[in-house]
Amino acid sequence: MAKQILFREEARKALEQGINQLADAVKVTIGPKGRNVLLEKKFGAPQIVNDGVTIAKEIELADPLENTGAQLMREVATKTNDVAGDGTTTATILAQSMVQEGLKNISAGANPVALRRGIEKTTAYLVEQIAAQAKPVEGRKNIAEVATISAGNDPEVGEMIARAMDAVGRDGVITVEESKSLETQLEVVEGMQFDRGYISPYFVTDTERMVAEYENAYLLITSNKLSNLQDLVPVLERVAREGRPLLVIAEDVEGEALATLVVNKLRGVLNAVAVKAPAFGDRRKAMLEDIAILTGGQLISEDIGIKLENVTLDMMGVARKITVTKDKTTIVTDGSTKAAVEKRVAQIRKQLETTDSEYDREKLQERIAKLAGGVAVIKVGAATETELKDRKLRIEDALNATRAAVEEGIVPGGGATLLHLSKGIPAFKANLNAEEQVGADIVCRALQAPLYQIAHNAGLEGSVVVEKVLEKEMPFGFDALTGTYVDMFAQGIVDPAKVVRSALQNAASIAAMYLTTEAIVVEKPEPKTKTGASRSGGAGMM
């Protein structure tokens, strides 16, 4: 395939066009008065969303050069979403602003490598300042505030997430499901989560979110390593006859056994997903027994005389729902094993009383928490399928933001933190050389962009709002919902520090890479041929 090569200004301009197209589509969603974006779907109804990363993932441009720029921007949103779970639109706006400002300076003769160093040093300084400004999350009120803002100013969602955290604790498991009714409800059920994800990405059922989700599934729980196909076939046949999905939890699944599960899943013969067993050594066996008791199954192990080929359906666990991501597995049960779970918890508590080891004590407490803590399930309801999808995305964002807030604290929201921190950059840049100072100025101007866009989406002149907020001190900012200037903490307009930090770091990283790009190599588009004619002049058949 022939390649197209562009250099210097021409290369950067082509990339910038792609960056701007993606960023312009994403940034209309920021703030309480942000708009929605409609995404066409090849199958089914179009999707109307307000979520930056979902929009970014959908954008594929026809021009390969512009598409490369759009992919760079998509990386900003995806990485921020992976780390913090929210703040993707802010990250996109910051990156676009840094790219535009940087390009102006490079065109005027600035050194790209010095700009990059200036951007990186200023970002490192700002990350320290964000941590210094963060306040720890205190009580239910703060949790509800963070969730409300992240869900697009929906106090009902904020209150529900606060209740869910009350029910299962701050480190507890909270999952989001689609409800059959119009109302959004919260219920606490028996369940467990452990830190192991799918062995192969071919097991995923939702390629957008990269998760495998099944309802009413069987669980094969074994301490053996599965590699031989012959051992597994009888079990797979029994489950396939029932027409229900299967979750395999084993020491490892490899070779023929893994290939068979993947092929059956892809062909639609048997919906299956395989994960490695949690923990190590004796603790692994104990955890597997915990999962077996929770799901009403048995641990299949040759140590206790049960061979894989002899496994019947009543030896297998049953889950109401399973959700497997690349690094976590969540099992939700119907609560029918409650008595057995309580008995198991009492047994672990006895072990806890007799142990002297601090490490063992910690691990036993962890097992009790996993077994007894349960799972809070937020069942999302809406009038239409389109509204349901959008609402579910908003609630997932709010949940991620709340967890991030518990982790690193909260800062004033609505773009106020970044704007106020820009005041410290003139003093900081005295430590940089003249060329690096230009990089610091690029970051300083970019910090105004999120608030500017929030005001713009609310139908106001962004630069006027930015000036008014700059006249005041932290934590003052602009409440776009009411159009007033307020104390952001007092008003409950807060962002998780982790979200603000991740957005800034990822935006700076991509902008710095872009500004030091001197050449692009992309595939040359094939010349269009006339319909029906082959490239060899129509002499294709003899």
UniProtKB/Swiss-Prot annotation:
It comes from the Bacteria. Disulfide bonds: none annotated. It catalyses: ATP + H2O + a folded polypeptide = ADP + phosphate + an unfolded polypeptide. GO terms for cellular component: cytoplasm. ATP binds at residues 29-32, 86-90, 414, 479-481, 495. Transmembrane segments: none annotated. Keywords: ATP-binding, Chaperone, Cytoplasm, Isomerase, Nucleotide-binding. Forms a cylinder of 14 subunits composed of two heptameric rings stacked back-to-back. Interacts with the co-chaperonin GroES. This is Chaperonin GroEL 1.
